Amino acid sequence: PRLRGMRDDAKRLVLKTPPLFCASAAEPALRGTPRTILLDVPCSGLGTLARHPDLRTLRTPGQVAGLVDLQRRILDAVWSYLPSGGHLAYITCTMNPAENEGQIDAFLARTPGASLEKQWQSTPDAFGSDLMYGAMLKKA
């Protein structure tokens, strides 16, 4: 559904649609060498509490720790497909620092040649919806 939405948005905005596909990030079946990868990682979803208040009681610390580990593995796996000079956009819908800034800081510390170009976190009133986090990484 998200990929379809991206295609529809690109068409509506009269933008060239980039190559889009859905794959397991653990073993992405990439053809060619992508210059930019958008990584919308599985997360705790705590930025959606306004719409899903039950998450407050459904998410356990163990589940969140498992998601942080999964995010780490996905970042490491996908990074290897990026060419020198390529970009990786890392996106979550959580406000949990361990899944956001903490994840990116740890990635930068263990990954030579990775740099942070920009990061942002939406505020509750910025879009009138979910809290989102994003980081743009560049490979040297």
For each of these PLM feature ranges, what is it?
Residues P1-A140:
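S-adenosylmethionine
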